[in-house]
Amino acid sequence: MAKNPNKKIQEEYKQAIKFGCVVCKKHYGVYTEPCIHHLTGAGMGIKSKSFIPLCFEHHQGSQGIHYLGNFTWEDKYGTQEELLEYYEKNK
C-alpha cells in the first residue's frame, strides 16, 4: 500500500493543480484541471517528485499516455522529460 505524500509533496501537487494540464497549456494555451501523472517507471516513494500534471484526456482518456502507450503519446506531445522541463520552467 502506498504511503500518503508528505506536506511538501502535497504542496507541490496543489501547485501542479493550479498550473493545469501541461499538454493542454503547452500545445493549446488553455487550462484544464489535471491529475498527477508520475513519469513512467518512477513509481512512488523517493521518485514521486518526478511527475507532471495531466488532464484526464491526456492521462487516461483516448488521447492519454496510458491508452496510447508511451511511444505514440510522446511522439504526439513530446517526451515526459521534455514536458517535465516545460512544467518546471513555467510553474
Feature map (PLM): residue ranges:
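Short cysteine-rich loop/turn motifs with clustered Cys
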Residues: 6-35, 57
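Phosphate-binding glycine-rich loops and adjacent basic patches that engage nucleotide phosphates
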Residues: 12-19, 42-54
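Acidic/histidine-enriched, beta-strand-rich ligand/metal-binding domains
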Residues: 22, 30-33, 38, 42, ...
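Polybasic, low-complexity binding patches
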Residues: 43-52, 60-91
